[in-house]
Amino acid sequence: MSGISFKSFVQSQYTPIPLPNHDFTGQTILITGASRGLGLEAASHFYRLNASKIILAVRDARKGPECIAFVRQYNPSSNTTVECWELDLTNVETIRQFVAKAKNLARLDAVILNAGMATMSFQAIDGMEKTLATNVTGTFLLAIGLLPALRLSGLRNNIRPRMVLVSSQGHEAAAFAERDADDIFAALNDADKTDMTDRYDTSKLIQLLAFYALKDTVDKSWPDSITFTAVDPGLCDTDLTRDIPLLIRIIHRIMKMLLARTAEVGGRCLVLGAADDEHSHGAYFKDGVIGSPPVAVTDPEGVELKNRVFSQLKSLLYSVDPQIMDACPVMESDEEAIRLN
């Protein structure tokens, strides 16, 4: 694990995660990647903690009834509303429809950006490698599209909504060889040159950089309006690695048997990260504990890379769906974005 101390990783994995006890009464919580794993387990915790409405964003709407039944199983008589909304982060039209639907919510307290994928084979969707399309461009087109709904919810209900990114310690291991390219995303989408064995870690680093840059952008235009928090749930026993080669999957399976947290415990981390609406702004939760942002986004090199990545990402997102971007007042095209277009 380049950039990661194995000793600290093991210690982290064996750190107990407390059961969340925050009261979410009256709140509406939206979770992406909620058909399985951490997202579904987090939804169950929000349900237990009295959330008023839980929105499960799932790629396959046919799984909706099963997901809702899982969340409701421990207290079927609860007054909490659980809904499934279709969302495929590689499909711009479903993102557009999802954002439009969210605008009709009377209240939106927290958005948990949990959906993600990992693969080592290059597969392009509309010209974008699938891991990037899911973990980066789709995630941030959705996040930016939901910002106006969060802002309006805050004003209407006198609250400070939260946007929570599910991160990964893997960002510390990312080689990210494309970081010095004139056009980072074009380099990442070059099937002949890019290293897919590094793709997941690199996507999580880009995700983290862009998330903190988005936080900075919102802070300037809408100060004290939305809390941005990143959460590292650690290695968890989910099927995230189901699409990687068999031999590596077997190695991962052994590592998970020895070190992984259960999906339920990982789900606790997401809930803990979403519980605080003020003091956790800009924080990075690890092992269920609030901490400072990673060095990757705070040291001079990281700050420069953060701003450059986000500038190029904005340009890319404007080319993907200018309507969603223009609908968010804080997303103004800067000179770099215009140049790249």
Swiss-Prot record:
Entry keyword NADP: yes
Entry protein name: Short chain dehydrogenase FGM9
Gene Ontology MF terms: oxidoreductase activity
Family: Belongs to the short-chain dehydrogenases/reductases (SDR) family.
Residue positions binding NADP(+): L38, K63, D88, N114, Y200, K204
Disruption phenotype: Produces significantly smaller lesions and fewer spikelets with blight symptoms on susceptible wheat cultivars.
InterPro entries xref list: NAD(P)-bd_dom_sf (IPR036291), SDR_fam (IPR002347)
PANTHER family in the record: DEHYDROGENASE_REDUCTASE FAMILY PROTEIN, PUTATIVE (AFU_ORTHOLOGUE AFUA_3G08550)-RELATED, RETINOL DEHYDROGENASE
Pfam (any one): adh_short
Annotated EC: 1.1.1.-
Organism in which the protein naturally occurs: Gibberella zeae (strain ATCC MYA-4620 / CBS 123657 / FGSC 9075 / NRRL 31084 / PH-1)
Encoding gene, per UniProt annotation: FGM9
Pathway: Secondary metabolite biosynthesis
Function: Short chain dehydrogenase; part of the Fg3_54/C64 gene cluster that mediates the biosynthesis of the octapeptide fusaoctaxin A, a virulence factor that is required for cell-to-cell invasiveness of plant host. The 2 nonribosomal peptide synthetases NRPS9 and NRPS5 form an assembly line which likely utilizes GABA as a starter unit (loaded on the unique module M1 of NRPS9) and sequentially incorporates seven extender units composed of the residues L-Ala, L-allo-Ile, L-Ser, L-Val, L-Ser, L-Leu and L-Leu, respectively.
Coiled-coil regions, chain positions: none
